[in-house]
Every structure is written in C-alpha cells, then in structure tokens.
C-alpha cells in the first residue's frame, strides 16, 4: 500500500482538534473514555505513573492488548513506540493502529535518531519542549505534536513551561527579518523552510496538544487558554477517585475552556485527584521530558 503523504496525515490529526485523548490500559477503560467524550484513546499496558513507579525498561505494549482495545471502541486508537524504534512502529502500523506516539514515556531505543516518520502511512505524534524540537520532529514527518510535560506526575508545571516556550518562540520569529530567520534556523537546528513558514503564518503547521501532568478540568482549561489545540490525559483519570466523572469533566473543561462557570460546575465533587509529585523531587536521570533531542 502506498505511503500517505505528510499533508494527508496532518489532515487526519487536525480531526482531533479541540478534543481529549485518554490513556487506557483495558478495553473497559477504553469504553469509559469513549462514553465520556474522548476523541481517541492511547492503548497502554501501564500508565506513565506506573511506569515511573515500577522503573525498568518500558517498551511497546502487547499487540493483543492494543487489538482488544481497538475492538472495544469506535474512536481512533493510538499506541506508543520507543524513540528511534522503527520496528515497534512497523508492528503498530501492521496491526492497524490509527496514530503512533513516538514517546519519551517509554525507554528510548536509539540515543541519536528519531524514527523517520515519512516512511509510514500512519500519522505520528511526537513530544516537544520548544520550537526547535517541534520543527525537528515535523521535518522527520511528525503529523501532530504535544508538549512533553512530565508524565505520570499529576503536576502540570512542565506542560505549561513547554507550551509557553513554543508559543513565545513563534511570536519572536514573527518580528525577525530574513537574515535573522536564517541564523535562528541554524541555532535551533531546524530547516529554514519550516522556520520561515511558521514566521509567516504565526503558527505551527500541525496541531499541538498538551500532555504530561494534566490532572484536573482546570489544568486542561489552563493549557487550552495558553493556545494548545487539545489535551492528552494519562494517569490523571484512572488514577483518580472517580474516573468516569473526572473523564467527563476534563472533556467539558476542554470544550468550554473559556467559561469559568462551566469549569467550576464540572469540577465539583470529583473525588480525590491522583497523588502528585513535585518535579524538583525527581532525580534528573528519571525525568522523561529530557529524552529525545
């Protein structure tokens, strides 16, 4: 089968705009996510909070689990491959996954190369902490971006940092002349054509979601107000006291992110949020956001 063009894959990712994508580890959780209004689910064996707690090498999930989740829902199913592990990505494409997340939540397989995403029919989503990482991933064929945040912490501070970094750098680009854009492209190691396009249009050529540490409806609305196109929620739903109610609330807050009254209403009586971790208490070698380059 012919490989999809990058433009087609970007169009597929655009269809998720304004929505919430939820991490699920069972078909039952996937059904809960779909009923709550998720636009897609991320099929995993372990949510990031468990990967963080249990340590060891985190790899692609068992294809059998991913297929069981695919059969349980009608919405798109995403799955994660390790950074640089193009064979895991080939397997995920072969079993019919709708989107592949080349994810720093899993243990990187290659410390020098990300996957060449142009070789795949399936759209890829990748994490980024700044505009340089964003444009390098797009150059490799990513059809969708997300903040890296710090997954599995229930702490939104890194996602906020990464979103603000990308958008402030885009605003900076818009004030640069052509010579400055050439220099800037070299500094951030990104193709000049992409840098020029972003400077001209004032936005990324792909959708950019927030991910990492989003635990409450207010967290989701905060990132949406900062300018992201949608929300990934990992451990924040099924590690909380009332997953069904919290899932619905986060979807509502993402849709009505500019309406504090609705956010206040859906935030009532959600039960315990997931237990959070302060970023400065995490040893440097355990920080997931630093994986990838």
Swiss-Prot record:
Pathway: Cofactor biosynthesis; pyridoxal 5'-phosphate biosynthesis. SUPFAM superfamilies: Ribulose-phoshate binding barrel. GO terms for biological process: amino acid metabolic process; pyridoxal phosphate biosynthetic process; pyridoxine biosynthetic process. CDD domains: pdxS (cd04727). Gene3D superfamilies: Aldolase class I. It catalyses: aldehydo-D-ribose 5-phosphate + D-glyceraldehyde 3-phosphate + L-glutamine = pyridoxal 5'-phosphate + L-glutamate + phosphate + 3 H2O + H(+). Signal peptide: none annotated. The keyword Lyase applies. Belongs to the PdxS/SNZ family. In the presence of PdxT, forms a dodecamer of heterodimers. Catalyzes the formation of pyridoxal 5'-phosphate from ribose 5-phosphate (RBP), glyceraldehyde 3-phosphate (G3P) and ammonia. The ammonia is provided by the PdxT subunit. Can also use ribulose 5-phosphate and dihydroxyacetone phosphate as substrates, resulting from enzyme-catalyzed isomerization of RBP and G3P, respectively. This is Pyridoxal 5'-phosphate synthase subunit PdxS. It comes from Chloroflexus aggregans (strain MD-66 / DSM 9485). The lineage of its organism: Bacteria, Bacillati, Chloroflexota, Chloroflexia, Chloroflexales.
